[in-house]
Design a protein with these regions (language model features):
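Flexible, glycine/small-residue-enriched loop-and-beta-strand segment within the central core
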Residues: 83-93, 98-166, 192-203
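Terminal amphipathic alpha-helical/low-complexity segments used for targeting or macromolecular assembly
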Residues: 1-76, 194-198
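C-terminal/domain-terminus segments
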Residues: 167-182
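Short-chain dehydrogenase/reductase
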Residues: 154, 172, 188-190
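Gly/Pro- and small hydrophobic-enriched strand-loop and loop-to-helix capping segments
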Residues: 180-186, 202-203
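Extracytoplasmic/periplasmic beta-strand context in beta-sandwich domains
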Residues: 165, 186-187
C-alpha cells in the first residue's frame, strides 16, 4: 500500500479537492469517499446513463457524447452500449478504437489505449486497489495503478485486466483471461493468470 498522506490542509476546500484528485490519479493513497470524488463520479454516471439510453442508430450523438466523456477519443471511436466507467476523463483511446457490449473501466488512474485496438464483449479494466487487511479496507482508503495497452491489440471477450498492467503492441489476449502482469509486444497470451503461449514471427 502507498504511504499515507498527512499533509492535507483542512482549511482550504478547493485545495483539498485538487489534492485528492491528484492523489488518486498519481497512485497515492486517497479517500474514496471524499465529496469531490463522489460528485465527479455521480456526474459521470449521469452522462453514462444518457449515453446508454441513446438509440443505437444515433451514431453522431453517441460519438459526440463519448468525446465529452473520455479524456481522448476520435471521430472513429465506437463503443457499443452499454458502457460503464467511473470518471471517463482518465480514459484515452487512439484511432479506430472499438469496444463491444458491457465494456467496463474503473479509471481511478489513467487508462491509455493505442491505435487499432479491438475490445470484446464483457471486458473489464480495473485500476482501483484495495487493502487485503479488512480494517484498512473498511476505512475506504484506496490507491490506483494505471493500465496501458499498445497498438494493434485484440482483447477477447470476458477478459479482466488488473491494476498496473501494461500490454504491449501487436498482442492478442484470449477470451476469459485474467491479466495480472505485463504482456510483451508481439504475442498471444491466454489463461488465468494470463500467460504468453506464442510469439508472432517477425518478418
Amino acid at each position: 500500500m502507498p504511504a499515507k498522506n498527512h499533509d492535507m490542509d483542512p482549511n482550504s476546500h478547493m485545495d483539498n479537492d485538487s489534492r485528492v484528485w491528484e492523489e488518486m490519479i498519481s497512485g497515492r493513497e486517497y479517500d474514496a469517499t471524499h465529496p469531490y470524488l463522489l460528485e465527479k463520479l455521480n456526474a459521470t454516471k449521469d452522462r453514462i446513463w444518457e449515453y446508454n439510453k441513446l438509440r443505437p442508430s444515433m451514431l453522431k450523438e453517441r460519438n459526440e457524447l463519448l468525446r465529452e466523456l473520455l479524456g481522448q477519443s476520435d471521430e472513429d471511436t465506437f463503443i457499443n452500449q452499454p458502457f460503464y466507467c467511473d470518471y471517463g476523463c482518465n480514459i484515452c483511446v487512439g484511432r479506430r478504437f472499438f469496444a463491444n457490449f458491457n465494456f467496463t473501466v474503473l479509471d481511478e488512474a489513467p487508462v491509455t489505449v493505442g491505435n487499432d485496438c479491438f475490445i470484446g464483449p464483457n471486458v473489464s479494466i480495473y485500476t482501483a486497489c484495495h487493502s487485503t487487511d479488512p480494517v484498512e479496507r473498511n476505512s475506504r482508503r484506496e490507491w490506483a495503478k494505471p493500465v496501458t495497452i499498445g497498438d494493434n491489440v485484440w482483447i477477447g471477450g470476458s477478459v479482466t485486466i488488473l491494476p498496473g498492467v501494461t500490454i504491449g503492441s501487436n498482442v492478442t489476449i484470449g477470451a476469459g483471461s485474467v491479466v495480472v502482469k505485463d504482456i510483451p509486444d508481439g504475442c498471444v497470451a491466454v489463461g488465468n493468470p494470463c500467460r504468453v503461449v506464442k510469439f508472432l514471427e517477425k518478418e
